[in-house]
């Protein structure tokens, strides 16, 4: 019996390579960042200062889950103020549009009812889960909004486009509550030191 070894040669011609899955989302986010950065939307000079002691805080987040409870409990512990919650979907195809509608809704409040600061919050998630917060229309709305906005999207390692165009970015929803109101004891001490 005889054995013949055959050798084959293959040639692959590649015209285009595209990043698939999470890589394509990261590429899209980076392209949006470049575009918005060129427009000046991320510039520090446009950041609005947060009020030291707001009368009312608007919170845009999911009505379920730990995020809303963390924010409410932390504000209550520090310095209770009136809070208006605008529940939205924080994940999925309509989420960015829902958040834009919530901002529009807050802007239509009468002056005396309008929040002094707004927190947009969501817990952590995958790149895909956080894509609504990388939406270009939402980023522009956050940048142009007349009320200061604190973004609290995800955890320490998560950064979204609205984090760059909000007036203050914090790493967690609990941190957003801490930045929104002072500690009652700090305020009392400040008043006592003033006298």
Residue spans of the language-model regions?
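Short, glycine/charged-enriched hinge/interface segments at domain edges or termini
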Residues: 1-86
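Short glycine/threonine-rich loop/turn motifs
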Residues: 58-195
């Amino acid at each position: 019996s005889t054995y013949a070894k055959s050798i084959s040669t293959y040639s692959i011609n590649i015209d285009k390579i595209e990043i698939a899955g999470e890589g394509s989302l990261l590429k899209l986010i980076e392209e949006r960042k470049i575009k918005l950065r060129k427009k000046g939307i991320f510039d520090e000079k446009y950041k609005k200062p947060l009020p030291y002691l707001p009368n009312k805080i608007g919170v845009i987040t999911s009505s379920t889950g730990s995020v809303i409870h963390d924010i409410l409990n932390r504000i209550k512990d520090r310095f209770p103020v009136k809070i208006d919650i605008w529940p939205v979907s924080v994940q999925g195809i309509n989420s960015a549009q829902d958040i834009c509608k919530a901002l529009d809704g807050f802007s239509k409040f009468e002056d005396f009812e309008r929040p002094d600061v707004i927190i947009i919050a969501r817990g952590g998630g995958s790149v895909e889960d956080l894509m609504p917060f990388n939406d270009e229309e939402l980023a522009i709305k956050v940048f142009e909004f007349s009320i200061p906005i604190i973004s609290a999207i995800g955890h320490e390692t998560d950064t979204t486009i609205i984090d760059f165009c909000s007036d203050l970015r914090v790493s967690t929803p609990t941190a957003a509550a801490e930045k929104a109101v002072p500690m009652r004891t700090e305020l009392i001490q400040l008043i006592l030191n003033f006298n």
